[in-house]
């Protein structure tokens, strides 16, 4: 679902930071 994709994107942002 969009919620799952959003969660993965958020995690990627944290790792990138």
Swiss-Prot record:
Expressed in skin granular glands. Keywords: Secreted. GO terms for cellular component: extracellular region. Transmembrane segments: none annotated. Disulfide bonds: none annotated. It is found in: Secreted. Belongs to the Frog skin active peptide (FSAP) family. Septenin subfamily. May act as an antimicrobial peptide. This is Septenin 1d.
């Amino acid at each position: 679902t969009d919620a799952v994709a959003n969660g993965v994107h958020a995690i990627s942002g944290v790792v990138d930071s």
